[in-house]
Amino acid sequence: VVSNVDPKATFENLVGFNNIETGVVRRVSNLRMQGNAAKLHLALSAVPQFTGLDDAQLGQRLIISPNMKQIDQAFNSAKYGEFSGETIMDVSIPSLHDSTLAPEGSHVLSAIVQYAPYNLKQGWSQQARDSFMSLIVEQLEQYAPGIGELIVEKQLLTPVDLSEKFNLTGGHW
């Protein structure tokens, strides 16, 4: 079987559990498929200035992860259904390379925010989303002072959103 979707969707929905051996069904059923990354989109009124980066560097993929201890702490928080006080982010500003993504003078920032648990203890209510978004923007401010003032529009897709909107099992991508 060749498939472009995750193993659970492939075997459960496309092939059908009734068409495969019990051992395979058990292994597929036991796969952990809960995502732990959120997707952030920001519409910005201008290009953000990250401290210490020149224009060429700003156009590259930016990883915000000061040290291994922070990664470990963020992972542990997610493991227990919480988001970390300091997130790990993979940030890009694609409009620096493709001006059609935003109106003239404006930009878009896209980030993968690691260790955002699918099963957040308090659930992904609007209050939880707002708290997480505030935390992310506050952290971005440490690296790109003034970025909060540039935000025209923002969107946060949690693992639950990714599961529901894009049919990604467990919001895992």
Where are these regions (language model features)?
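Short intrinsically disordered, low-complexity coil segments enriched in acidic
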Residues: 1-4, 173
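A glycine-rich dinucleotide-binding beta-alpha-beta segment and adjacent secondary-structure elements
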Residues: 65, 84-92, 146-173
